[in-house]
Every structure is written in C-alpha cells, then in structure tokens.
Amino acid sequence: AIAAVITFLILFTIFGNALVILAVLTSRSLRAPQNLFLVSLAAADILVATLIIPFSLANELLGYWYFRRTWCEVYLALDVLFCTSSIVHLCAISLDRYWAVTRALEYNTKRTPRRIKCIILTVWLIAAVISLPPLIYKGDQGPQPRGRPQCKLNQEAWYILASSIGSFFAPCLIMILVYLRIYLIAKRSHLRGPRAKGGPGGGGSKQPHPVPAGASASAKLPTVASCLAAAGEANGHSEPTGEKEAETPEDSGTPALPSSWPALPSSGQDQKEGVCGASLEEEAEEEEEEEEEEEEGEEECEPQALPASPASACSPPLQQPQGSRVLATLRGQVLLGRGVATAGAQWWRRRAQLTREKRFTFVLAVVIGVFVLCWFPFFFSYSLGAICP
C-alpha cells in the first residue's frame, strides 16, 4: 500500500510540474519574468520525484541500501541540493512578491528576464554550497556496522546545524517576515481605501460644482426646447411660449462660464435662465448617476469647448474631436472631454493588477505554509539529534 501511494505521488508530481513548465513556456499570458521562478521550482520538484524519491522508497522497503556506496554519497548530496533549492526558491519568490508590492514602479523596471535568471542561479549556488561539503569532507564516519549497508545523512553536528539553518530555518524566517509585512501593507491600504476612494480620477466623492457668480441659484440647464428657442431668437423670431426676462448689456456681452471654472465677480444681476451657453456639468452628472450601475468607472470631465453664442451652442456639431465621447440625453447633447477612457482604463488596469498580485500572494502564502508544516518535523528532529545525540 505504501509503495502504491508513493508511486502515485511520484507520477502526480512529475505530471503536475511538467504541466506548469509547459504552461509557462507556451502561454503568452504567463511569460512574465517572475514566472521563471515557477519553472525552476518545478524542475527541482521533478528532479526530486525522479532521482530521490524512488531510491528512498527502495531503501525504506528493503531496510538497507541496495545500491553502491558511491551512489549513496551522490544520492545524499542530490537530496540536500534539490530540497534546499525548492525551499530557497520559495524564499526568492516571497522576496520578489515583497519588492513588487513595496517598490512597484522601481522594481517592475528592474524585473527583467536576465535579472530573474541571475537570482535563480544564485538560488542554485546557495543550495550547492550547502549540499557539497559531505562529498568533499568525509569526517569521522566511525566503524561501519556489520551486516547490510546503510545510507544515512552526515552525522557531524556542525554540518547538521549549518545545513538545517541554511536549508530551512533561515529561509523559513525570511518568508514569514516577508509575508507578514505584505499582509500589513495590504491591510493598511485596505483601511485607507474607503477614505481616499475617489474613482479613476483620484478625487474625492462627488460634490456639486460651484455656480458662477451672478448666476441664479434656480437656473435651469439648457434643454432641446430652450436651444431651439435661442436659435429662433438668433434668426429674429420670438419665443413661442414662456416669458422672457430683460437682458442687460453685461449678460449679452459676457458668455457664461462652465461651473468648474473659477467664479468671476459680477454686479449681482441674475443671468438669463435656459441659456445654452451655461454650464452643462450638472446635466452630465445627472446622466452619469443614472448610468452608474451599467457603466462603472465612468469619470466626469469638463466640457470640451465653450460656445460663443446660444445659436452656435444649440447647433449640432459638425465634427467631433477624435478620442472624445458624447453623452446624448433627452434634453440635449453633452460633449465630454477626451482622455476619459484612457484615464479610466489605466486606473482599472492598475486595480486589476493589484488584485492579481494580492491573489497570487495569498496562494503562495498557503503553499509556503503547507510546505513549512511538512518540512518542520524533519528539520526539527534532525537538528535535535545533533544537539542531544
């Protein structure tokens, strides 16, 4: 039964890690430089499944080392090499996550394939430095027991403690501190988010824009009917319905400014209600509120241009600027500024990237937690045997 379970684990490990390597190398969306860590880690796991576990299984089932003594020394060195490489790979991945979160702009420019390959090479060199001493320094192995040969790890106390610290305890401490730091940063940004939440533009909550000085507080925004009426006035016709207020020279000579422009001093006289040159910002806000559930991420923008006269304001535009957006309503047509889609897309793209980073960090934290729990009993007992023989 044990042999069947271990054999299944060997096949599952080889198949699963081969799929990881194949996915990273063939999928365009997974060709990010940091995914090279996963390729190298999967290669180390495949080497463990093919060169280490089968011989360990045979040694456990037979009760002695069936193979040659030379292969026993190589086997033990490879065992330490591949297992240490797997643990240090996880440590390097956690540091990569930490730098990506804390130094996003600076580190993303430095996260090149060449830099990642250099880090991977350093990981393998660290594992080699920890695994090679038993091959070079034999130490006092003591008399060989009579009977069947055994293949055991180096029993030197200094090597046991040094290899345990370098292979497990130091990387484990680094990973715990790094992921704790990432968690605190994510929690701080989550608590800060509702206070500074202002949409793609980075502003605060929506507030009504100030009305220009001299404008009536009850002034209505232009509608299609008022636009047609203003056009009729420009052609010499009077309004079909409604009362018309007297127009002062100041009102006729000064065009109304958008509500988002700074207020100008005026004589305190009320301006004409229904003028098409008035601000269209409030109407745009009303329409944005109606379509907020259907189109998330919409950002209000200032009017693109200020018409010189009511007639020109009410006339349909002959040509719209490229990249601009038009909000058509039952009361008229509002031309929103260009660049809104670009700003919104950048904000949502950045938010999606941060979400993926957090999700990937959470998955790695779970994997590393399980990995540490699986390795801790062995390294604890292995180190305890050197301290208390």
From Swiss-Prot:
Q: Which residues lie on this side of the membrane: Cytoplasmic?
A: 26-36, 96-117, 181-363
The record's subunit annotation is: Interacts with RAB26. Interacts with PPP1R9B. Interacts with GGA1, GGA2 and GGA3.
Q: Ranges of Gly residues compositional bias?
A: 196-205
Q: Which residues lie on this side of the membrane: Extracellular?
A: 63-72, 141-156, 388-389
Annotated site location: Implicated in ligand binding: D79
**Disulphide-bridged cysteine pairs:** C72-C151
Q: What is this protein called?
A: Alpha-2B adrenergic receptor
Major place of residence: membrane
Q: Give the membrane topology.
A: Multi-pass membrane protein
Bias (Low complexity) occurs at 255-267, 303-320
- Subcellular location, record wording: Cell membrane
* Pfam families in the record: 7tm_1
Listed GO MF terms: alpha2-adrenergic receptor activity; epinephrine binding
Q: Write the record's keywords in alphabetical order, separated by commas.
A: Cell membrane, Disulfide bond, G-protein coupled receptor, Membrane, Receptor, Transducer, Transmembrane, Transmembrane helix
Its biological purpose: Alpha-2 adrenergic receptors mediate the catecholamine-induced inhibition of adenylate cyclase through the action of G proteins.
Per the record, the GO terms for biological process are: platelet activation; regulation of smooth muscle contraction; regulation of vasoconstriction
Record organism: Equus caballus (Horse)
A GO CC annotation given for this chain: plasma membrane
Sites marked Implicated in catechol agonist binding: S163, S167
Region Disordered: start and end of each range? Answer: 194-216, 233-320
Keyword hit for S-adenosyl-L-methionine = no
Membrane spanning stretches: 1-25, 37-62, 73-95, 118-140, 157-180, 364-387
**Biased segments, Acidic residues type:** 280-302
